[in-house]
C-alpha cells in the first residue's frame, strides 16, 4: 500500500499514533494504550469512511 493510499484510508503509523496519543492524553498508561489505539483508529476510519454511521444502523437486527 503506498503512503498516499494509506493516508487516504486513515492508516496511521504506530510512532505517529503514539505521538498523537501522548498529545491527547499527556502520555497515557500503557494498559490503556491499546484501547486508545483501537478507538483512535476506528474514529479515524469512520471520518474517512464514505458511509456515515447512520447508514449502517438500519442493517442492525431489531430486537
UniProtKB/Swiss-Prot annotation:
There is a cross-link at residues 43-49 (Lanthionine (Ser-Cys)). The modification 2,3-didehydrobutyrine is found at residues 30, 33, 38-39, 54-55. One of its GO terms (cellular component) is extracellular region. The keyword Secreted applies. Keywords: Secreted, Thioether bond. Maturation of FlvA2 peptides involves the enzymatic conversion of Thr, and Ser into dehydrated AA and the formation of thioether bonds with cysteines. Modifications are processed by the flavecin synthetase FlvM2. This is followed by membrane translocation and cleavage of the modified precursor. Contains DL-lanthionine, when coepressed in E.coli with the flavecin synthetase FlvM2. Its main location: secreted. Signal peptide: none annotated. Residues 1-28 form a propeptide. It is found in: Secreted. Lanthionine-containing peptide that does probably not show antibacterial activity, since its analog [+3]Flvbeta.a does not show antibacterial activity against M.luteus. Also does not show antibiotic activity when tested with [Del2]Flvalpha.a, an analog of Flvalpha.a, which is encoded by the same operon than Flvbeta.a. The bactericidal activity of lantibiotics is based on depolarization of energized bacterial cytoplasmic membranes, initiated by the formation of aqueous transmembrane pores. This is Lantipeptide Flvbeta.a.
